[in-house]
Amino acid sequence: MYTRILGNGTPLLCIHGFPLDHRSLLPLDRIFGLSGNWKRIYVDLPGMGKSSYLTGINGYSSVLDNIQKIIDEEIGSDEFAIFGYSFGGMLARALTYMNSEKVLGLGMLCPEIIANNSARNVPVRIPVITDKSFLASLDPAQRSVYTKTSIIETRENFEKFNKYILPAFSSLNKQNIDSIASNTELIGIPEPKSYKFYRPTLFITGRQDNLVGYIDSYNILENYPHASYAILDGAGHTAHLDQSTLVDSLIQNWLERINNFKEDYS
């Protein structure tokens, strides 16, 4: 499975959404790099990005197994933090459950909590800002993908979407994508009622996120006693593009809490 490593220090495993690739998380790399000594390990999940060639993928658990191999090979017995976006947030929760003694902190951006689309609590997509003349100028195929989840429909927002989100769709392995979606079972998901992860945790959700919403994240907060939970107005499923300053601030605080935790318990 493809990995891209940036920086040095404590490992920070970064897991993207479905069906994207690691580039969707690169807008956050600046704040990761400014918030301490972090070795950012970005992955491309099976069937996506530069891991599109992988075979033998059957369901969410197969994806999880591939990431666990990366943890074993790249991180070993060291402690590390995890940050997951969308589907990556669900994987991050499962990996935290599996590696709870080694995980220093869990961060999630617009996390998928419930795999079944029809069972999610999500708002209707209502754009907050729309530049109609700009949308009309887009290629119909680009406009169709963009407007499925966008709520800040401007040239500036689309340029970020076009740079960090859209390119992933051209490298998908449809067979693998379909295989992943065929079986959504994951260890530790949903979290057992008795399960608690006591280390610094972060939920960043979008008030206008019509893909995974924000209510389902709130409903599992009791499993994470040291979680900060943020619901951002003017943010959809690409909250880090829609409200970048707020998202950066929240991530910086989360990483500071992890650093303080390491010092207190070292």
Segments from the language model and where they lie:
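Active-site loop/oxyanion-hole signature of alpha/beta-hydrolase fold enzymes
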Residues: 36-83, 249
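Flexible "cap/lid" loop of the alpha/beta hydrolase fold
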Residues: 93, 97, 105-136
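Conserved alpha/beta-hydrolase catalytic His-Asp/Glu region
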Residues: 119, 137-195
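Conserved alpha/beta-hydrolase "acid-adjacent" motif
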Residues: 210-216
